[in-house]
């Protein structure tokens, strides 16, 4: 049987001119379209490489069924075509091909961070990706791609509906880059749902453009705008966008310059947002004045699960305002307050607010720069009794003797393993013996109770909590089934 391979890879019309091309995405494979020859343009993603000669490959006769070998041959040809296309694009752009990209262009994840591509190297990559159906996540951080490179990427995205995640952080995009990105996402549908734009010199005008696009485009789910220069006006634009956007689920705004006005405006938009579950506002330094607005967000918002407000100059006064929101919040699970000037008094306000809320779902409170006392630990025991799923991370306990400190910090799994070894049983057998039903699962509440009451391996509250963290399925249950392979 003779198999005649096509003379060139079948590509979307953005790459080959004046040829019969594959239909647009969504067009049946047997439909084709004919385009007239266009004039060459350095601003378009065209690769005018001559088509390679027709290759005829003879294969031995086989049974009337496809085999893995036939499929592999087809895939090999597809890969060869992609490689040739990229090499021709590099020749056209006058750049040296990236060997890593050639080796990995048929993988789902391609990491080209810190490769020094520049605008023309980025364009060569974009040309190769126009027809690529394998790459779903592309990393291009720190390549100095600038606005010319961004233009090549968005032209590629008009044809490529397979790429889903893209990182173009730290590329000096500035206002013009923000304009190109915003225009594309405002006017075009795309498969991109995760976009990282950290450290691109975006200022207030850039915020206005990006927020205008995000006010109508709900395809983006995860957005990183950290390490930019948004301030009060940028905060107002972001707040207005968040009030109407129903797509974003994760937003990183850390390391910007939000002051009181901008941060409060941002919080106002968050109050009624119904999709955002993760928000990072750390390292903005907006102070206690914004804490009241944050407390209102926690009181009214029913969607936010993760909130990082570390490094924002929030003291005990701000902690008091935030605690008001924690008293009624039913969705938040993680609250990070690390690197804020909160002392033990502020920390007590926070944990008591959680205790007073029977519907709290809090799992982690990060106050890891706060020194606490033994009295705080006793108060915390009462909170843990109500909310056993909670983990409060603090710096250390003041005034403990070295012996007591060692007792508190001894790895509980090693103690249990030692007991199991002495009695010639497995660690799973130890836990099953504590379960009245003898099964591999218990509720967190019941497990905590029996671990405190058992006298085989004496453990304190904090060691029991460490055991729970290792076994917790995050469903309110602990599971012993994987302990045979767990290291102490």
From Swiss-Prot:
Superkingdom of origin: Eukaryota
SUPFAM superfamilies linked to this entry: RNI-like
One Pfam family from the record: LRR_6
Q: Where are the LRR repeats?
A: 134-155, 162-182, 191-212, 219-239, 247-268, 275-296, 303-324, 331-351
Q: Does the keyword Lipid biosynthesis apply?
A: no
Keywords assigned by UniProt? Leucine-rich repeat, Repeat
Q: Does the keyword Repeat apply?
A: yes
Sorted alphabetically, which SMART domains does this protein's record hold?
A: LRR_RI
Q: What is this protein called?
A: Leucine-rich repeat-containing protein 74A
